[in-house]
Structures are given as structure tokens and as C-alpha cells.
């Protein structure tokens, strides 16, 4: 079969491209996805409060593991990635955070990326979004991604934690995606008005999947991209458990949207990557590109947990005998505890004036539990997820075999610089100062984790090594740019190759300040216009906050 475009990966970026490209009825698109459908009757992926469940299984999660991380007690750490229509937007925490304006302005300083500054990206964030309280200079009201804002009457602990951050001397902000990211405030979520997860499968593919010019193949594992010389011409993939490969051809382009872990793997297997990797697995080089799989970045975070003196936390919702009622309210009304991811407040701060924009992120949660649903504390409690935003540490991804079913070797090299340790120590100490504020006096009990005895630098470092976990934000492994380690240009085109683009979180040159999903969707929206060859949306004129010489904290 021949299509105009073949998209590899029906995730946060691939579904955007499939939807936008098939708006033209004369353009044919094949969308290949290694996972299955996003079953709408499966509460694990559709109920926001059930976000921990997909991470515990394998149906929707590739469940990669890292190599032993040398600075983290040689732990093999989780690296969950979404599998199925929606990709990681099918299993993520649904936090709608776009990053800081300065992240994009920094990207735009790199040669060839001049049009990736914030004011050129903002129109594409708006294009993708329908915010439940309407549009303004920063937000959209007619896009495929449903965004829900926290409502009055939500858990009192959210308000107390934001108030405590302000009492500790940090700014207050009413919109973490608006004029000013820096500060504490309410956190939006990608949830529909009916309380369902707003994955890109729901938001984008639902409007496109009935189009005759879009073909969606699930359980289709891409083996390699096929080339004629240096021109990408087709894809070889396996359908289900069938060991006979399928071959499809592209008239125009192949768009690789398999994510920060799988995109570099597919390139390497196809003969595009570092010479030593291609040689090791006896792969004929199509084009030697040393940056494929390099520059890997992520966010690391810790949980600081406290007992709650009043019975206001979500602890009762963890009890099996309360869950049928919560489930029924969500199923029939789309409301209640089940309709929220429970990350309804958070913030971004600078740990010192040496950072020009926030370097620490907080998510507040009114229960004490691990992100993947394990190790729930058997008392009323609450916690802050806290971690650094722009670690200088860099890792890598490389294939371990030519077999597409084999997981790659992943090394993030977490905490490999002195800056990492300084930021994490500061983050723990600042969090404790916030938790000690009067706003939390009615609620704050004993510190559960790390525990009040953990005070010295050495003790804090040991806690980080033993307990810090991924925030599930891998990116950067096929970075945009023009330098010798860049893999794609500012339009996602692979250097040295014709008719092949990479469009997903792997192309971010530097990780952003916050969760990655909204930005990955924005990147795909912006790239869709580049692929179509149409004029970009006009740059925004909106103001945005630059800290300048403002203190990081008022005394």
C-alpha cells in the first residue's frame, strides 16, 4: 500500500499530525501504533483519579527500565511510556502545564530555531486547547484538548498549601500557564467536562478517525524505516504476533512520532545514528548522525509526606469499600473524586537568584501515596512532589538488538552534576519551610518522609539517592538544532535525509520547566503547518513575566 504520509506512533504528537494532515481530503495518511485501542470502557485509562493503574500494568505501559543509575545507588529506575492510541497522554498524570515562556525564548537563541520563541509558540498552545472557563490572550476555547480548571469547593488542603507557599515569601499566581508561571496557584488538568481523561486519542482522533483518508493500524510494531539512498521511502512493521513483516510506502514523507525512548531506537535500527552503535549491531549505515539517542533528559522528583491532623485528606478514597460509590458518581455523573487527577494545586519557584526563571516545581496532593499507587500511608496525609526543572545531567538511549520487540538500553545519568545536588537539597529545605507556615497549622502532623531526623546534606543526599523517582518526562534524544549533535532542523527534518521528520518530545533541545504533554502537542500543531507548507499563525502580542532582578523570595 502507498500513502502520502506514514506516521509512526499514535501518541501525543502523532495523533495531532494525523488529524491536521487529513483535514485535506486529498491527503492520505497511515497511522501506525504498536499498542492497542484506547478502550473507552476501561476505567483505568478513562477515570482521572485512576491514573496510577495503567502504570502498574503492561497493557498500556511499555514499562521500560533504566540501566543501573550510577548516582542513584545503582538502582534500575522506572521509565513508563504509554502504549496504545494516545501514547503517554493515555497514561499520564493529566497535568496541563506548558512550561515557562523563557524555555522557548532560550530554544529560539539556537541557530535555526528562531521561530520557536514563546510568542510564536503561544498561538499553537491556544489552537490545541478548549479551556472550560473560556479563552483569553493565553488560552483557547475551540481546540481538541479539553482543559479543566480547579473549582471552588475542592479539597481544603489545596488552598492551604498554596497559602503556605505565599506565606513563605513566594509569589501567588492565578494561572500557571498565563502571564506569570512563577509562584503557587491552581493547576489545570486535561480532563473533559464529563470527567474523562482528555487524551489525544479522544481529543484529536475522535474527530478524524471516520475520515476515509485516514487509516489507523493498532498492534503494528515498526521494525525499520526503509530508504532509497538517503530518501525515506517506506516502513517495515509487524502486525500483532505475525512474524511476516508488512511493507508500506510513503509518497511524501514519513513522520516519526514514537516518543523520546522509541524514536531514537527506530532511527538506529534503520541505519541512522552513531557510527559505533550501527557497527556494534552490524547495521548498514544510511546516514551517520552521532546525536541520535544522545542528550536524553528527564525530571526527577521526590515526595515529601506529612500526616494530616484533620480527616480531610483523600485517604478514605483508597479504601475498597468507598470506591464503588466514587466510581458510580464518576461513571454516571462525571463528577466527584473520580473526575480529578487530584493535582489541583502546585507551583514553580526559583531556589536562588542565580536562576533567571523557576528551577523547582511543586505538585500538591491531598493524600500520601506513591505516584504509581504503591506504598500508600495508612493514615490521613498529604504530600508535595518536588523536583528540579532543568538538570544539566544528560543521558543516552541505544538499541540492545535489531529485534524491534527488545527494549533499549536507557541511561538518564540522573544527579550527575553538583547543581543537581544543590537544587535537591534546597528543594527539600524550602518545602519544609513552606509546610511549617501558619496556613498548614490546622492540618500538619508528623513528617512521614523523609522524616524530621533527616537534616544534614549527607542525609538529604542519601534520601534522594534512595527515594527520588522519575516524573516520567523523558525528552531531548533527537534534538532540534544545527550543531553536530542535532538530529533534526527547526522543521523536524532529519539532517542528511530526505522525506523523514521526527516530531515528538525527543526533539526538544532542552527540557522545559514543567510537564511535557502540553508542549509536545503544541510542537505537533506547529509542525503540522510546516508540513502543509502554510503560513504560521501570527505571533501573539501577549505580555509575559520576566523575573529580571526580582528577588526569588520575599523575606
Swiss-Prot record:
EC number: 1.1.99.1, 1.2.1.8
Pathway: Amine and polyamine biosynthesis; betaine biosynthesis via choline pathway; betaine aldehyde from choline (cytochrome c reductase route): step 1/1
Record-listed FAD binding positions: 4-33
Pfam families cross-referenced by the UniProt entry: GMC_oxred_C, GMC_oxred_N
PROSITE patterns named among the record's database cross-references: GMC_OXRED_1 (PS00623), GMC_OXRED_2 (PS00624)
SUPFAM superfamilies in alphabetical order: FAD-linked reductases, C-terminal domain, FAD/NAD(P)-binding domain
Top-level division of the source organism's lineage: Bacteria
InterPro entries referenced in this protein's UniProt entry, alphabetically: BetA (IPR011533), FAD/NAD-bd_sf (IPR036188), GMC_OxRdtase (IPR012132), GMC_OxRdtase_N (IPR000172), GMC_OxRtase_C (IPR007867)
Record keywords, A-Z: FAD, Flavoprotein, NAD, Oxidoreductase
MF (Gene Ontology): betaine-aldehyde dehydrogenase (NAD+) activity; choline dehydrogenase activity; flavin adenine dinucleotide binding
Keyword S-adenosyl-L-methionine among UniProt keywords: no
Swiss-Prot/TrEMBL cofactor(s): FAD
Chemical reaction(s) catalysed: choline + A = betaine aldehyde + AH2; betaine aldehyde + NAD(+) + H2O = glycine betaine + NADH + 2 H(+)
HAMAP family: Choline_dehydrogen (MF_00750)
Name of the protein described by the UniProt record: Oxygen-dependent choline dehydrogenase
Source organism of the structure: Proteus mirabilis (strain HI4320)
